[in-house]
Amino acid sequence: MSIEELARENVRTLTPYQSARRLGGNGDVWLNANEYPLPVEFQLTAQTLNRYPECQPKRVIERYAQYAGVKPEQVLVSRGADEGIELLIRAFCEPGRDAVLYCPPTYGMYSVSAETSGVECRTVQATDGWQLDLPAIAEQLDGVKVIFVCSPNNPTGQLINPQDLRTLLEMARGKAIVVADEAYIEFCPQATLAGWLGEYPHLVVLRTLSKAFALAGLRCGFTLANEEVINLLLKVIAPYPLSTPVADIAAQALSPEGITAMRERVAQVLANRDVLIAGLRETPCVEAVFDSETNYVLARITASSAVFKSLWDQGIILRDQNRQPTLSGCLRITVGTREECQRVIDALRDQPGLAATERV
């Protein structure tokens, strides 16, 4: 029996998540992973590397709870929010019996984590405005244990209607966990569902330090939920999910000074986003620019595959969304520095496109 034959059947047929780094490229303008464009500096203060770290570092948990406006017992820290997705599926879904549900176009790790665990994936296509199709979701709920909703949604950038989220939570009460993925919530903090935890025992909120906190390389995420859910997740998480240096830097990032710095970065990103959107809307090859509540912009572009390759050859790396449902011709552009945004605009202006009267 070959090594391939020894592997689980669902792993043999699995298509791995195509992360921005896995797709590669040799550019000098990286606008494909929704990262903060400049490095932030921290000095390590914890020097106890000879000892195992805390399973759930107290200082990190307490600071994040204070920042998010929840109780420490409602916080779990993990190796990025991606681990939170995996833990929820492992804790709540029986392989071969239960299902998860999500609404494409959306983040790809929901399906990868479910398929890796042998859990069925059900999809309900988002509406034309990339909102929830609630009647269609209601028809698919039998056997669903976890529902993933990304808000703001990646890659489209819009918020999910809060009244629709309430309807979904009522629809799923006693049937399924509803997970609100808030990886980008710092760019629109008024829209968080963290304050709803007291109303909905089956609500879970995912957060990360990868985006607005500019710590994508740290791999530190958070799951916010009621204590009953957190206790179940603690049963399936690895004993030491965060290394001592990661916990040290995370705690610094969540200090009052760290949060102030994060908010200053967000303000700069939002200003740069306005510049990028305005420039894109004046560019002939750009057919449509969609409103965004995040640190990235989705645009529909004439001959998008050729444009993507042209910019790639110029060292400008974007994220091609052509294979996502309803996103034919779309590229996702991370908001970089002001100079990087201008390079994108200038490069796109050199591409053939439509007359201004034909664009939307």
From Swiss-Prot:
Gene Ontology MF terms: histidinol-phosphate transaminase activity; pyridoxal phosphate binding
Entry's EC annotation: 2.6.1.9
Name the reaction it catalyses: L-histidinol phosphate + 2-oxoglutarate = 3-(imidazol-4-yl)-2-oxopropyl phosphate + L-glutamate
For the keyword Ligase, the answer is no
Q: How does it associate, per the subunit comment?
A: Homodimer.
Q: Which InterPro entries match?
A: Aminotrans_II_pyridoxalP_BS (IPR001917), Aminotransferase_I/II_large (IPR004839), HisP_aminotrans (IPR005861), PyrdxlP-dep_Trfase (IPR015424), PyrdxlP-dep_Trfase_major (IPR015421), PyrdxlP-dep_Trfase_small (IPR015422)
| Name used for this protein in its record | Histidinol-phosphate aminotransferase
Q: Mind telling me which Pfam families this protein's record contains?
A: Aminotran_1_2
Family to which the UniProt record says this protein belongs: Belongs to the class-II pyridoxal-phosphate-dependent aminotransferase family. Histidinol-phosphate aminotransferase subfamily.
